[in-house]
Amino acid sequence: MDLYEKYFFDLNGYLVVPDALTADELAQCNDAINNNTDQMRERPEEKSLSGESRTLKGQQGRGDLDGMLTWPRPWCDPFRHLLAHPVIVPYLVELLRDGFRLDHLYGIIMRLGTEGHVLHGGGTADDLTHFYQYHNGRMRCGLTVVAGAVTDCGPGDGGFACIPGSHKSNYPAPRDVILLDKDIGVVTQVEAKAGSAIIFTEALTHGTMPWKASHDRRSILYKYSPGPLTYAKTYLPQGVEAVLDEFTPEQRAILEPPYRPNRPTFATDGILRQAI
């Protein structure tokens, strides 16, 4: 992270990294999704994410994608590559330290009219897995998300939204504000071109605005934790253990369970320093 990126992330709690993915990587992700549409599950009404919000209501629930790391080849390959992407790893080393690990991942598909997601998280939450601190001259985070934009998310489209700076807030956001039913000018819809990565701390108050664009929103969310911590109950995505030998040393390092001593680590340039 350069000086400007550090300042922006510390101030806002998120950062957009443009062109994190190449055109080829982007095409491979979209091709994989196109060939596995049967893996998408649209949320039924009883699992709605919009709560009691009037503003976030939609015509249908969000589409969720799971299991990308174990899809048949070649469709799993682009998502395995993203695990330890050379552009992203240096950011994770800065925010989570050199022994970071994958906590969990999933994909999001939103078509025109898909509901939004109530804003959640924030600096007031007493959660030992969702935190943001500045310590000894460096930022450090708990659970941190890398949301890869597989399609464009332009102005007014909807999608990822947050309250910038709320990762350091001292007051909880009022309920009608996180429902987006009252606008006091603090919520931002974050624009991201396809191929961009939105990196944010889960300590940030964030959620999703209803999708209003004619094209689908496609986003793949990789959620990482510091090496000794876990948020998810399980340590590996379902089915991965059986095919772990197919992953590269860098990918296997990131799939390690939570522990502290003698973890495989990455240098600030993203190079694996200690292989398993």
Residue ranges and their predicted role:
Residues 39, 43-46, 197, 204-205, ...:
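Non-heme Fe(II)/2-oxoglutarate
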Residues 116, 145, 160, 217-219:
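Structural motif
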Residues 115-121, 128-131, 156-162, 171-175, ...:
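A short secondary-structure junction signal
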Residues 110-111, 163-169, 223-229:
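Short edge-strand/loop segments of extracellular domains
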Residues 1-11, 18-135:
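Non-heme Fe(II)-dependent double-stranded beta-helix
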Residues 50-56, 121-131, 175-186, 216, ...:
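Short, surface-exposed loop/helix-turn segments at secondary-structure junctions
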Residues 7, 139-145, 151-209:
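Double-stranded beta-helix
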Residues 105-107, 146-148, 220-224:
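A structural signal for short, well-ordered beta-strand segments
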